[in-house]
A protein has these predicted regions:
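Active-site C-terminal subdomain of aminotransferase-like
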Residues: 15-16, 20, 29-30, 37-38, ...
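Conserved N-terminal alpha-helix of the aminotransferase class I/II PLP-enzyme fold
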Residues: 16-67, 92-99
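PLP-dependent enzyme catalytic core of the Aspartate aminotransferase-like
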Residues: 98, 107-109, 128, 294, ...
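Short, solvent-exposed amphipathic alpha-helical segments in soluble enzyme
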Residues: 100-102, 216, 305-309, 361-365
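Pocket-edge structural micro-motifs
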Residues: 8-12, 36, 63, 292, ...
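Conserved PLP-enzyme active-site core in the AAT-like
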Residues: 57-257, 264
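N-terminal glycine-rich, Lys/His-bearing helix-loop that initiates the first secondary-structure elements
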Residues: 1-29, 369-372
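A residue-level signal for beta-strand positions that form part of recognition/binding surfaces
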Residues: 5, 31, 320, 343
Length: 372
């Protein structure tokens, strides 16, 4: 059939005690045992995500992207360990490392996202994992993931990557040396802003550990959410291509605007890590930031408030365009943010880009009025 059905059920029944015991023995394969272990609806989505990542052994699903990041780290860390995180990390990743992992006796340090192979100079005797995010979702530095992974592998350190921006469609992470790849499926996988979900994919070495950690922590997604995510997955490629084309058109237009300083889009030559993006990525998604010249918080707010086709919201990757004021300096500890003007992050959705540029032009009129 075209669409796998939504298989709802908390309890799986067995024909007799012999089948019950056989099910218990084969529990490790993640198949029928109890509803928390999933059903064909969840399994079909997980299998599809695994097939999209060359070299993968399996995928676990989680009720949010933060749950996916947290469980992936918990699967490879123990008290006394240290984890390195990019200084451009998603803020909830920092919070989990600085607060929750600290309570468990696990320390965290942050590194310059442009450090590349020199990250090896930061490895200590207790460094057991490194969490990358490339590009960062505020300032969009593209990391040299293959170089970092080679350094990590040589030191016996697990390399994890938040790959939400590119997905495996534009950046097959395991092929570039990553051990464990994470996506907030809420974003581009689902694509319709109606489901929260995370996914973690890995190869044979870490698959059993990842799966058991998720099961022991009771991580499960509903079959209805899995069905909707699978629906989104079917149109992922065509949506990403439209996000890419529209975002790049708008980013180039913004570079010509007198109100704009930096445009932080990895496909633009002056974006940090652009050469790495050209080498490693198959495309760019619809999320990027730009800096307003000579502005302040008040004029930035006037610009955003004047937009009618851009919603104001924290998420991204959906069909709708969003605008958000962001302040990356607040989230840096190992490096300093070099920008001089207020930053705006745009999620370019699936609307007509000409309409979006007209809306942004109207916003710039209000921006200029707020400065006068």
């Amino acid at each position: 059939m075209v669409n796998p059905p939504v298989w709802r059920g908390s309890t799986h029944l067995y024909d007799d005690v012999a089948h019950l015991r056989e099910g218990l023995k084969s529990n490790d394969d993640g198949r029928f045992f109890y509803g928390r272990r999933g059903s064909p609806t969840q399994w079909s989505l997980a299998e599809a995500l695994t097939e999209m990542e060359p070299g993968a052994a399996g995928t676990m699903l989680y009720p949010s992207g933060v749950a996916a990041i947290s469980c992936a780290l918990l699967a490879v860390l123990q008290p006394g360990d240290e984890v390195l995180l990019t200084d451009s990390s998603y803020d909830p990743s920092r919070s989990f490392a600085d607060v929750f992992l600290k309570r468990m006796g696990i320390s965290a340090r942050y590194y310059d996202p442009l450090i590349g192979a020199d990250v090896a100079t930061l490895f200590g005797p207790n460094t057991k994992a490194i969490l990358m995010e490339s590009p960062g979702s505020l300032t969009f530095e593209v990391q040299d993931v293959p170089a970092i992974c080679r350094a990590a592998q040589a030191a016996g350190i697990v390399a994890l990557l938040d790959n939400t921006w590119a997905t495996s469609r534009f950046f097959p992470a395991l092929e570039h040396g990553v051990d464990i790849t994470i996506v907030a499926a809420t974003k581009y996988i689902v694509g319709h802003s109606d489901v929260m979900m995370g996914a973690v994919t890995t190869h044979d070495k870490y698959w059993t550990r990842l799966r058991r950690t998720a099961q022991q922590l009771g991580q499960v997604v509903s079959p209805d959410d899995a069905y909707l995510a699978a629906r989104g997955l079917r149109t992922l490629d065509v949506r990403l291509r439209q996000h890419e084309a529209s975002a790049l058109q708008i980013a180039r237009w913004l570079k010509q605007r007198p109100e704009v300083g930096l445009v932080l889009h990895p496909a633009l030559p002056d974006c940090p890590g652009h050469e790495i993006w050209k080498r490693d990525f198959k495309g760019a998604s619809g999320l990027f930031s730009f800096e307003l010249s000579d502005g302040d918080d008040q004029s930035r707010a006037a610009f955003i408030d004047a937009l009618t086709l851009f919603g104001i919201g924290y998420s991204w990757g959906g069909f709708e365009s969003l605008a958000l004021p962001v302040d990356p300096a607040k989230h840096r500890t190992a490096t300093q943010w070099a920008g001089t003007g207020p930053l705006v992050r745009l999620n370019i959705g699936l609307e007509d880009p000409d309409d979006l540029m007209a809306d942004l032009a109207k916003g710039f009129e209000h921006y200029q009025s707020a400065q006068s």
